[in-house]
């Protein structure tokens, strides 16, 4: 809002609080969607890893390494989905914190 240390009127504070509440509400949907995407990617990775492991030949270590190498793209998708969820979650928490700060001004 005001970056120059100009005092805010009660109306400005109330408008900012309303804006934060709306952003938090939208953020809940974003977090839920991102988490569902992460869970989908995590299941896909687990499934691909298990299939690659079972199809591989050799010792246990050899099979693990082959499965790991073959499933790197799925792991990357899972990691990207995890990062997106964590980012949305941190943003949601930051907005919630800002809302608490603004409410304490009122």
List the model feature ranges, each with a label:
Residues 31-63:
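Extended alpha-helical coiled-coil "stalk/arm" regions
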Residues 57-84:
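Short, glycine/alanine-rich amphipathic alpha-helical segment
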Residues 13, 17-20, 49, 67, ...:
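Generic structural signal of hydrophobic/aromatic residues within well-ordered alpha-helices
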Residues 1-27:
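Short, charge-rich amphipathic alpha-helices with coiled-coil/heptad character
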Residues 20, 24-27, 31-34, 38-41, ...:
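Amphipathic alpha-helical coiled-coil segments
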Residues 2, 9, 63, 80, ...:
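Sparse, context-dependent recognition of short Cys/His-centered cofactor- or disulfide-binding micro-motifs
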Residues 105-106:
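Conserved small/polar residues in nucleotide/adenosyl-binding loops
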């Amino acid at each position: 809002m005001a970056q120059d240390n100009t005092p805010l009127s009660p109306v400005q504070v109330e408008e900012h609080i309303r804006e934060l509440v709306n952003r938090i509400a939208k953020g809940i949907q974003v977090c839920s969607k991102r988490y569902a995407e992460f869970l989908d990617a995590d299941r896909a990775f687990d499934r691909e890893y298990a299939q690659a492991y079972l199809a591989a030949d050799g010792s246990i270590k050899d099979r693990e390494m082959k499965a790991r190498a073959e499933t790197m793209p799925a792991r990357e998708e899972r990691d990207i989905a995890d990062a997106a969820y964590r980012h949305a979650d941190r943003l949601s928490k930051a907005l919630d914190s800002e809302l608490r700060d603004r409410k304490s001004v009122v």
